[in-house]
């Protein structure tokens, strides 16, 4: 009997395990080798089975799928026994984690928990007895096998044995590595791996290990967790014996290697060859950089020399062991030796041409293996001749007319001894349209030729006679120079390199400075020779039109003459003439200024960003458009649904530099919800103070998240504010933390004191305080010394010391005075400044917690060294450094002796032993090259140090008496020298302007110090904002002139000083060459103006500090200005519950900061003098999902009596009397709390102030509810109240409880309870057992009495239903009647769910967004975007014509015209298209792509496309087809074949359909990416002789498609390019299946999946939009005539609905039948169709589950795990099944809830819902009352959006690729009891039938020790 029972249990257990797919609890099982499977021949399918997949070789993400012609099951609930029995007829061997499920009634798929393992053969069996509803039946098993990719070993050490070259030599104890595509069985690798010496049969064995870095990590990428084949499996090999030197080996992996998890062993050898190192030897001298298309990098015709050795060298030893004789030129970096290299390069510029050198290699040259050369090697080297070259200055160069500078063309060894050149005199007006020489000159073929004669290897300078060419002493010349310099080979042809240089040279004596503001301009002209201002210079201003298409004769928009100071001012009217027609309010003007004096002229051009950066300010541009400086703020910013919110708007704005109030103006108010949807809130009118106020009720159904409230005025002004809707239960107590030190040092103790009080005044006596103390590195800078560097720095490759961030965690109880204390010691391991953060969390009797934090800075020393210097210096020049010594507060310390060292940084690589193998490691050395000592004073000390050569240096400063480095300070500088490092030219034109302060008060005098490099100069000095406020022109002398100016209110809130310094003095032709760098320096420095006069002082005085709930409070308000004078004004006053405010820390905004926010310095400027040449030149979330909250609509009332209100009073406009006084009276709600009165004042004159005060409401005896926020039916809770005794007396406390409604006491009397107990002096909790009886609302009332004082409250407690719904769908396409079986179980819950039926005549949706996107994205002049926009315009025109859709503001023909114009400009002479303007050769990829757009456009828009354009393109593509290898980037076969396929497809579009090269292309099919394979299949389908091959590709593609009830998604492997995006793959697959005339329902699913890839109605990019719309148009052509049919829906003979589909006006019908109207049992749903057209249908049956539910994985998989916060041990993990034993958690603790979601295919719009049990509350980390010390584990970033509700967590992902994803959040156990914990659920938002759910479980929350 016992045996029989055991056998029965075993059978049941086996059945359960089978249903679970070898996965009992829905949790991953361990990995083990899989049993072998013999291959089977693909079976012949019976007619009623349509398709099996996959067959042959499958990818890891392929779906196992079986499709049937007829339904196997009716549309019914997922848990019907018949379904489960049918699924037993599907088997997979070996069993993999997962289970079979019905995708639709006609399709079954395997839902895998992991990707299919690599190197595995699997067998799928459909068992005998499997039948459909039409009684087709299998009378025997039907099986087939498929296998995944075989084991592939790559990156083998050494080289391929068939290669002639040897591998890099290896060490005798090498650490070798190889890569596998799958995890391997290590024992089998060791068994089948040998290293065989050359000529031997036996070899060495290896120790094989998986590389540490490759072992799976906790935070692994989602795809790698799901599909291990996505990882690199790298293995380390270590020979078991030492190898022999100078020996060749073969590394052989023989057949038979097993995967760690799989069943297919390797069936072939993997071999490589390698060799050990030989004695170090010199091999040969090589040459690099010979003349080619890019010039002569190696300088000489034969190239630059390199010394090649057989082993890798130690770089430092090479530099000391190579000698060259005769000695080369002394230039830096004569030798170039890279780490891990065996080649030494010699700098060719150190060598002379046609000269023989002797190179001696010393015997001590060392290689990486520690060997030396042993004996010196000497070799001769002849440089040979210099390669031909030509050089001439490019771009614009200005030569001062009085200085004899020349334009030289420098040539050397030109092969033909000639060059070509062209010259043209430039007129001033030419510059309106042209900015470069190449625009002004004829084509190079028309240029004149000039002979050059000179000696070989000697540079010849040809001087261009400028004045002769210009025919004047001044003027401008455009020139172009070209010469043949060398021949080179390309594609078998010999070509000439012909470099072409264009330039402009100007002879002038005029320096021109032009500056523009929104309403004015300034032009200054000085002579270049001596800087004297030019009086009466003629000024002409033109609009700069470099992009103009037509070029009429230019006319100046403004003219004038300079005054005595050389200045011409442009007024507003003149400037408006110059900006007419441009967007003046948005963009700065683009202007050309011509200044002339007699025949001499010069120019400056102002472009959009001229002078914006690099001169001391980041200039803006405000224009004349008003800019908002106002705001909308609320009473408390944080709300719950069902509450009311108040808002006040301040409508201030900045226009033309003036701040104004928008009084008596109408504003349209709009609410923007978290999803971006907008709701109008009507119109508000501002009052005489420029403000308005409004009340807004927050609906009960309002979504959680962040909302924006916007107000738009008629003048375009917009102000806005933000608020948040959340669910929360605010704690009614607070915590304060105080530290006894702000700064601490090593060894110091810091005292922490924490205090906690209830908001109604009583102490939180006996509460638990938890201390969390952490630290992190801080970049500490004493206040006021922000420009200095402090403390040690660790420069690469050094790393800062790592020390633990955790300092201390401790618990303590609050004493009778509500206090707790803790001491922390600053540890001795402190290597750098650290911020110590102290978090204190207090929990009271209700188990709610509040946290607060403070921090202090721990420093290694109380003396801080500050260091300031530039980061770039010149070699050999003194480099200034400023030093200070300060204490942490910023006060300077004097008399401290410090040593400064300038240390050269030397980098090197050393070899260190890691795990027994040699690993290179970077290291750094510091060599002191200069040092000095100084003593600190009360001012910064300046010292100079000189770096001897270029390179990287460290400045190290430390105390002279220091015993360690703790107090040192470091900084890094870069030193430039004679090498090619070039740090930019603009810096030499920047003038340093220093102000004595950063902020001034109005009326103060500011001093500016000008750092002048000139002995004599003219200074233009100004203070500017959007215009010059102060201006001065003065002559200055010496290196540090000073300017003083008075700060005025007009400069509020900020301005900038500007200085333009023009060099004056003796003429420049009398100045020594090289002594003058430039003729002008320009600089700006911003400053702020103090705003204290803009503040009002506001006093708020409540009449009573403490009063009872429900009483009236009187509040006095008083307004004064900053000087204390009474001021009349307006007050916005609110009285808010502090419990809500402390969650967010909200206070109304500081309006002075808002209104007087920093204003842009609106200016642009240019100067022509930086281009002046002074000496000859040498050859040169959705926020929509928000986050937060955690409590229900009633939760706001959980701390209330009967009238809880978070807001007691709000008035947006309280007016004061003339003395600034006002009084309000507030009727208070019943809350026991602290009320905060907050007020914002304004006086109507742009002055503002804030004030607040608090008072409390309390009682002698008071009680507060201790209730959960909700309960579910069946929950048993311990809840009640807390009682605070403020009477000061003890006695008999009486508590009476009453409950009604859906909750009962769990006692003999279910409605009332009483308790008599002795009163305590502190706050005590009293809990009573209760039970949730039914869904609804229970009312809980408690009354307390003590010695004649009493308190009572009544609160609702909501009993929430658990709503678990499931959905089944059936979709399809029909030309006739169709019957769908439906089975509604008689026990189905009747009040929820039902049947939804959607019928449609087309699935093409309304398309508008791509049209809008083209309008915003049409500014790129490239071929691909232009071709994509042309395709979009063409397709939209087709859709518009067919479906009657209209696109506002989008004219298809006009947009097509614009795109064709762009493409015409990009077609070049060979007929192809350049990818971008200026590209010299056509791009074959974009040329082929553009064909489709042009052909489609010519069909839809007749005569739009020039036939010649298509003809030239056709000729070009024929050449590409014939010779794809002519492109340098396309030498590999794969690229050639892909290019040929693209050319064939394009030629076919052009009417030239060919089958040439198809055999070669088809051979590469397996190497093509998925999108190219789809294109190939579609192209092959056009040819009868290629049909089989096309179908094979389609069959393979079908395996890459994952199908569900309504979608078919192409699974795309990770790709490199945008041309293979998921949208492209989906669109191309849809086009292929249309071309192959596949089943209509498959085509519909592909279309639905393509539509699902849209975001905001668009596919994101022009390319994706073009691809998708092309597929949509081809889909639309499946129905050539508009539909005209009648569709009728019947169920069980009853007509549900009927619709006539005529044309595309109303293309869809939706019917819904509620569950209580559906007939029970089995019936047919009949869809009848009569007429012409196609009927698309979707039937969805959804129903609610009853009772406790097991989990279910129906398309998605989810598991839930619970652990203590910050702990690794998992307390419980739940999948499909839950343990019978309840989970018990301790009360008052914090736990981490982790959800793991597995997705086996790409999905869109995924929703995660995790219900909370009533005993737990989610922790909202965004609240300020939450401690940052407790952190949830890391989430997958793809699950970024979440909301916290009182009873659930909702998260969302927009798109997920296959993978394993995790979501974590924290909960706190607050209510003791026994609770239902429903399963976590994941589903697709728009396909809820695809879901996963964990099993429901029981939770017990109990106090510790119970």
Curated annotation (Swiss-Prot):
Keywords, sorted A to Z: Cell membrane, Lipoprotein, Membrane, Palmitate, Signal
Membrane topology according to the record: Lipid-anchor
Pfam entry (one): Big_5
Signal peptide start-end: 1-21
Lipid-bearing positions (N-palmitoyl cysteine): 22
Entry keyword Cell membrane: yes
Lipid attachment, kind S-diacylglycerol cysteine: 22
Subcellular location: Cell membrane
GO cellular component, one term: plasma membrane
GO molecular function: endopeptidase inhibitor activity
Membrane spanning stretches: none
InterPro entries tied to this protein: A2M_N_BRD (IPR011625), Bact_MG10 (IPR041246), Macroglobln_a2 (IPR001599), MG2 (IPR002890), SbsA_Ig (IPR032812), Terpenoid_cyclase/PrenylTrfase (IPR008930), YfhM-like (IPR051802)
Record flagged with keyword Ribosomal protein: no
Record-stated family: Belongs to the protease inhibitor I39 (alpha-2-macroglobulin) family. Bacterial alpha-2-macroglobulin subfamily.
PANTHER family attached to this UniProt entry: ALPHA-2-MACROGLOBULIN HOMOLOG, UBIQUITIN DOMAIN-CONTAINING PROTEIN
Protein name: Alpha-2-macroglobulin homolog
Organism: Nostoc sp. (strain PCC 7120 / SAG 25.82 / UTEX 2576)
């Amino acid at each position: 009997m016992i045996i029989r029972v055991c056998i029965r249990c075993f059978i049941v257990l086996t059945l359960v395990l089978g249903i679970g797919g070898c996965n009992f609890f829905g949790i991953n099982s361990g990995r083990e080798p899989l049993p072998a499977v013999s291959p089977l021949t693909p079976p012949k399918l019976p007619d009623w089975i349509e398709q099996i997949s996959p067959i042959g070789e499958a990818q890891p993400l392929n779906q196992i799928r079986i499709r049937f012609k007829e339904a196997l099951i009716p549309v019914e609930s997922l848990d019907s026994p018949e379904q489960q029995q049918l699924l037993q007829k599907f088997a997979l061997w070996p069993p993999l984690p997962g289970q079979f499920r019905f995708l639709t009634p006609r399709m079954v798929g395997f839902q895998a928990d992991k990707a299919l393992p690599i190197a595995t053969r699997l067998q799928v069996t459909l068992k005998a007895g499997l039948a459909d509803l039409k009684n087709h039946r299998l009378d025997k098993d039907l099986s087939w096998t498929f296998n995944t990719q075989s084991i592939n070993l790559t990156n083998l050490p050494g080289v391929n044995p068939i290669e002639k070259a040897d591998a890099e030599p290896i060490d005798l104890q090498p650490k070798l590595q190889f890569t596998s595509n799958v995890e391997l069985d290590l024992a089998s690798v060791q068994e089948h791996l040998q290293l065989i010496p050359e000529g031997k049969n036996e070899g060495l064995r290896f120790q094989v290990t998986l590389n540490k870095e490759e072992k799976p990590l906790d935070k692994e990428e989602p795809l790698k967790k799901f599909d291990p084949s996505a990882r690199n499996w790298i293995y380390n090999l270590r020979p078991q014996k030492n190898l022999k030197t100078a020996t060749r080996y073969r590394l052989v992996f023989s057949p038979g290697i097993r995967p760690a998890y799989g069943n297919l062993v390797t069936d072939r050898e993997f071999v490589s060859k390698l060799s050990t190192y030989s004695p170090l030897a010199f091999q040969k001298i090589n040459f690099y950089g010979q003349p080619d298309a890019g010039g002569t990098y190696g300088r000489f015709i034969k190239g630059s020399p390199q010394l090649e050795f057989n082993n890798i060298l130690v770089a430092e030893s090479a530099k000391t062991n190579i000698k060259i004789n005769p000695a080369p030129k002394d230039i830096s970096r004569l030798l170039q030796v890279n780490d891990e290299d065996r080649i030494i390069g010699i700098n060719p510029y150190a060598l002379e041409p046609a000269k023989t050198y002797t190179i001696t290699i010393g015997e001590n040259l060392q290689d990486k293996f520690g060997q030396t050369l042993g004996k010196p090697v000497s070799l001769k080297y002849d440089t040979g001749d210099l390669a031909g070259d030509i050089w001439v200055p490019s771009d614009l160069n200005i030569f001062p007319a009085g200085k004899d500078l020349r334009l030289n063309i420098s040539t050397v060894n030109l092969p033909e001894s000639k060059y070509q050149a062209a010259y043209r005199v430039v007129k001033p007006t030419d510059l309106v349209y042209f900015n470069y020489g190449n625009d002004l000159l004829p084509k190079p073929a028309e240029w004149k030729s000039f002979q050059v004669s000179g000696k070989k290897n000697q540079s010849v300078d040809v001087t261009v006679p400028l004045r002769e060419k210009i025919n004047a002493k001044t003027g401008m010349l455009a020139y172009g120079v070209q010469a043949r310099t060398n021949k080179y080979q390309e594609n078998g042809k010999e070509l000439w390199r012909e470099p072409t240089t264009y330039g402009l040279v100007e002879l002038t004596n005029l320096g021109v400075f032009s500056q523009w503001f929104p309403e004015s301009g300034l032009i200054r002209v000085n002579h270049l020779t001596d800087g004297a201002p030019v009086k009466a210079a003629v000024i002409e201003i033109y609009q700069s039109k470099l992009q103009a298409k037509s070029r009429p004769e230019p006319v100046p928009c403004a003219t004038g003459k300079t005054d005595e100071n050389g200045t011409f001012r442009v007024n507003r009217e003149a400037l408006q003439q110059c900006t007419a027609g441009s967007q003046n309010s948005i963009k700065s003007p683009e202007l050309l200024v011509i200044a002339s004096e007699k025949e001499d002229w010069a120019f400056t051009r102002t472009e959009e960003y001229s002078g914006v950066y690099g001169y001391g300010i980041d200039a803006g541009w405000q224009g004349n458009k008003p800019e908002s400086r106002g705001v909308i703020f609320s009473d408390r910013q944080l709300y719950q649904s069902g509450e009311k919110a108040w808002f006040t708007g301040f409508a201030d704005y900045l226009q033309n530099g003036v701040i104004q109030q928008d009084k008596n103006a109408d504003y349209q108010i709009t609410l923007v919800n978290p999803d971006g949807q907008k709701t109008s809130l009507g119109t508000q009118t501002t009052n005489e103070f420029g403000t308005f106020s409004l009340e807004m009720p927050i609906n009960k159904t309002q979504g959680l998240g962040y909302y924006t409230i916007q107000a738009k005025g008629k003048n375009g002004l917009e102000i806005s504010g933000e608020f948040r809707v959340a669910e929360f239960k605010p704690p009614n107590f607070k915590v304060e933390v105080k530290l006894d030190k702000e700064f601490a040092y090593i060894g110091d103790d810091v005292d922490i004191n924490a205090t906690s009080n209830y908001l109604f005044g009583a102490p939180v006596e006996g509460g638990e305080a938890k201390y969390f103390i952490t630290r992190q590195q801080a970049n500490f800078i004493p206040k006021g010394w922000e420009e200095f560097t402090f403390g040690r720095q660790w420069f690469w490759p050094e790393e800062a010391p790592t020390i633990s961030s955790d300092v201390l965690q401790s618990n303590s109880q609050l004493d009778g005075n509500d206090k707790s204390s803790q001491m922390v010691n600053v540890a001795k391991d402190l290597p750098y400044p650290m911020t110590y953060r102290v978090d204190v969390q207090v929990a009271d009797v209700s188990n709610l917690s509040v946290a607060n934090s403070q921090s202090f800075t721990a420093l290694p020393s109380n003396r801080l060294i500050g260091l300031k210097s530039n980061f770039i210096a010149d070699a050999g020049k003194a480099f200034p450094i400023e030093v200070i010594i300060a204490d942490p507060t910023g006060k300077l310390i004097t008399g401290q002796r410090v040593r400064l060292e300038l240390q050269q940084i030397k980098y090197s690589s050393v070899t260190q032993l890691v795990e027994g193998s040699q690993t290179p490691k970077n290291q750094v050395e510091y060599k002191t090259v200069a040092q000095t000592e100084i003593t600190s004073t009360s001012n910064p000390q300046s010292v100079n140090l000189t770096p001897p050569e270029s390179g990287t240096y460290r400045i190290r400063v430390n105390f002279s008496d220091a015993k360690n480095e703790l107090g040192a300070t470091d900084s890094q500088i870069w030193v430039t020298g004679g090498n090619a490092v070039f740090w930019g030219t603009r810096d030499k034109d920047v003038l340093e302007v220093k102000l004595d302060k950063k902020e001034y008060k109005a009326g103060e005098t500011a001093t500016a110090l000008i750092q002048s490099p000139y002995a004599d100069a003219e200074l233009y000095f100004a203070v500017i904002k959007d215009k010059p406020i102060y201006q001065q022109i003065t002559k200055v002398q010496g290196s540090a002139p000073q300017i003083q100016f008075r700060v005025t209110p007009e400069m509020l809130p900020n301005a900038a000083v500007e200085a333009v310094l023009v060099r004056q003095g003796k003429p420049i032709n009398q100045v020594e060459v090289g002594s003058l760098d430039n003729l002008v320096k320009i600089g700006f420095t911003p400053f702020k103006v103090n705003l204290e006069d803009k503040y009002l002082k506001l006093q708020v005085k409540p009449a009573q500090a403490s009063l009872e709930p429900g009483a009236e409070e009187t509040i006095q308000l008083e307004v004064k200005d900053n000087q204390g004078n009474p001021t009349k004004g307006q007050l916005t006053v609110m009285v808010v519950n502090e419990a809500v405010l402390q969650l967010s820390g909200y206070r109304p905004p500081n309006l002075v900061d808002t209104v007087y926010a920093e204003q842009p310095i609106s200016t642009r400027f240019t100067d022509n003098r930086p281009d002046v040449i002074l000496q000859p030149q040498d050859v040169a979330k959705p926020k929509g999902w928000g986050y937060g909250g955690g409590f229900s609509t009633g939760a706001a009332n959980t701390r209330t009596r009967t009238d809880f209100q978070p807001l007691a009073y709000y008035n947006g406009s309280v007016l004061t009397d003339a003395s600034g006084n006002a009084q309000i009276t507030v009727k208070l709600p019943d809350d026991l709390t602290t009320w905060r009165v907050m007020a914002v004042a304004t006086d109507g004159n742009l002055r503002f102030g804030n004030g607040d005060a608090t008072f409390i409401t309390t009682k002698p005896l008071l009680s507060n509810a201790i209730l959960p926020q909700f309960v579910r039916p069946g929950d048993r809770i311990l809840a009640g109240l807390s009682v605070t005794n403020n009477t000061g007396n003890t006695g008999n406390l009486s508590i009476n409880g009453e409950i009604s409604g859906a909750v009962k006491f769990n006692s003999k009397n279910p409605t009332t309870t009483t308790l008599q107990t002795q009163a305590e002096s502190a706050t005590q909790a009293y809990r009573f057992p209760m039970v949730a009886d039914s869904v609804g609302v229970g009312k809980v009332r408690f009354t307390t009495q003590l010695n004649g004082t009493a308190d009572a409250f009544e609160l609702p407690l909501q009993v929430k239903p658990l709503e678990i719904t499931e959905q089944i769908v059936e979709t399809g396409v029909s030309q006739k009647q169709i019957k769908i079986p439906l089975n509604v179980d008689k026990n189905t819950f009747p009040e929820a769910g039902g049947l939804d039926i959607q019928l449609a005549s087309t699935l093409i949706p309304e398309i508008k967004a791509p049209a809008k996107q083209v309008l915003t994205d049409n500014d790129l002049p490239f071929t691909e975007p232009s071709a994509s926009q042309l395709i979009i315009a063409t397709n939209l025109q087709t859709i518009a014509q067919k479906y009657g859709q209209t696109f506002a503001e989008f004219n298809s023909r006009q947009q097509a015209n614009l795109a064709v114009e762009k493409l015409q400009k990009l077609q070049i002479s060979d007929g192809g298209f350049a990818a971008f303007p200026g590209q010299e050769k056509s791009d074959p990829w974009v040329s082929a792509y553009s064909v489709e757009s042009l052909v489609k456009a010519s069909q839809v828009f007749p005569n739009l496309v020039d036939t010649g354009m298509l003809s030239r393109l056709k000729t070009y593509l024929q050449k590409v087809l014939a010779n794809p290898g002519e492109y340098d980037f396309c030498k590999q076969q794969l690229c050639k074949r892909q290019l040929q396929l693209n050319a064939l497809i394009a030629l076919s579009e052009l009417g030239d359909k060919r089958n040439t090269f198809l055999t070669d292309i088809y051979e590469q099919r397996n190497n093509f990416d998925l999108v190219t394979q789809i294109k190939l299949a579609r192209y092959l389908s056009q040819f009868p002789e290629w049909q089989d091959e096309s179908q094979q590709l389609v069959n393979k593609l079908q395996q890459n498609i994952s199908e569900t009830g309504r979608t078919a998604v192409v699974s795309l492997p990770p790709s490199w390019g945008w041309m293979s995006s998921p949208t492209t793959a989906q669109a191309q697959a849809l086009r292929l299946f249309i071309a192959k005339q596949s089943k209509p329902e498959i085509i519909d699913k592909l279309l639905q999946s393509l539509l699902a890839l849209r975001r905001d109605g668009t596919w994101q990019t022009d390319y994706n939009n073009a691809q998708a719309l092309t597929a949509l148009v081809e889909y639309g052509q499946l129905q050539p005539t508009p539909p005209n049919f009648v569709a009728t829906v019947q169920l069980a003979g009853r007509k549900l609905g009927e619709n006539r589909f005529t044309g595309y006006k109303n293309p869809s019908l939706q019917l819904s039948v509620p569950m209580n109207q559906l007939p029970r049992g089995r019936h047919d749903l009949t869809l009848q169709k009569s007429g012409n057209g196609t009927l698309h249908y979707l039937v969805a049956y959804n129903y609610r589950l009853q009772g406790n539910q097991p989990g279910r994985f129906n398309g998605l998989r989810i598991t839930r795990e619970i652990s203590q916060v910050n702990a690794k041990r998992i307390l419980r993990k739940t999948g499909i099944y839950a343990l019978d034993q309840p989970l018990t958690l301790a009360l008052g603790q914090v736990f981490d809830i982790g959800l793991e979601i597995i997705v086996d295919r790409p999905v869109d719009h995924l929703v995660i819902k995790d219900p909370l049990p009533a005993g737990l509350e989610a922790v909202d980390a965004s609240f300020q009352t939450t401690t940052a010390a407790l952190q949830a584990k890391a989430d997958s970033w793809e699950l970024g959006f979440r909301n916290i509700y009182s009873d659930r967590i909702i998260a969302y992902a927009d798109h997920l690729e296959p993978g394993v994803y995790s979501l974590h959040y924290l909960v706190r156990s607050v209510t003791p009891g026994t609770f239902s914990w429903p399963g976590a659920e994941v589903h697709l938002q728009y396909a809820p039938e695809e879901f996963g759910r964990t099993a429901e479980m029981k939770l017990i929350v109990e106090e510790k020790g119970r």
